[in-house]
A protein has these predicted regions:
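Conserved phosphate- and dinucleotide-binding cores of soluble alpha/beta proteins
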Residues: 2-8, 84-237
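A conserved C-terminal secondary-structure "cap"
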Residues: 229-271
């Protein structure tokens, strides 16, 4: 595990109002850094409607951070008991996406390769597979029909970021003539941020998290990637961003992700 995966030194629960716009010191957790990275990617492209799937607390935190910063976003979060526009679960999510009414979605994978292909099936040959992953759950449909997708995986290792996935649940690029509405925008990991370029089917390294180097990223990545001319260290969360994450964002997430809020933000849902 790299320094970027370690717990940052714990700081106060909220910054003073006089310092809200100053960059934060090293008093943040990796999960907070990744939520901020995703939020910045969200704001980089005009967006109206974002959908967040199940068991996705860090992308959900990123979306709520954008909202609390004033972005006029519509959020659709599966399994949220209050404020959820869906009454029929994922069926309505797929309907909206097929109609072109979802601008952004998030996907991960047990394996992700250099062409942004995702493997949510497992490794080894069917039926006696070596490892079984949770399953595709409509990921290919969402990947094809959403305007853009941010890929996300906390673990950054050669067993996850591979040269070629063992099975393709959702392809990152398609043959000419195959209709798809969008592609991956980026891949955020516990070590760095990659941007994806569908026209050439490759990732480029965009920024490196504190404690990592280009050499360490190459050593822990199973696929080849380009390096942007201006690649540098991933900017740390500002005190304003941390204050929102630990306050207003956590308030929105306590019901759906109580364990995540307790572990990351140190807050528990009232009995």
């Amino acid at each position: 595990m790299s320094a970027a995966d370690d717990l940052r030194a714990q700081g106060p629960s909220g910054p003073s109002t006089e310092k809200l716009n100053r960059p934060a010191p090293a008093s943040y957790r990796t999960e907070e850094l990744l939520a901020v990275c995703i939020a910045r990617l969200i704001r980089a492209v005009p967006t109206s409607h974002i959908a967040v799937g199940a068991a996705s607390p860090i992308p959900a935190a990123a979306c709520w951070l954008c909202v609390k910063q004033g972005a006029p976003l519509r959020l659709s979060l599966l399994h949220k008991r209050t404020g959820n526009p869906f009454t029929d679960g994922s069926r309505e999510l797929f309907d909206l996406t097929g109609q072109g009414r979802v601008d952004l979605f998030f996907l991960g994978g047990g394996e992700i390769d250099g062409q942004a292909n995702l493997n949510l099936i497992g490794t080894g040959d069917w039926p006696g597979m070596e490892v079984r992953f949770p399953g595709s759950f409509g990921s290919a449909f969402m990947y094809f029909m959403t305007g853009r997708t941010i890929l996300f995986r906390e673990e950054h290792s050669p067993r996850v970021l591979v040269d070629r996935v063992a099975h393709i649940s959702a392809p990152g690029i398609s043959e000419p003539g195959v209709y798809r509405r969008g592609h991956a925008q980026a891949l955020v990991t516990g070590r760095c941020v990659f941007h994806f370029h569908p026209e050439r089917g490759r990732f480029s390294l965009a920024s490196i998290h504190a404690g990592e180097t280009l050499e360490s990223i190459r050593a822990m990545t199973g696929f080849d990637f380009d390096v942007a001319d201006d690649v540098g260290e991933t900017p740390a969360p500002t005190e304003e961003e941390l204050a929102l994450l630990r306050g207003a964002v956590c308030d929105e997430m306590l019901e759906t992700y109580p364990d995540f809020c307790a572990r990351v933000f140190g807050r528990k849902r009232a009995a």
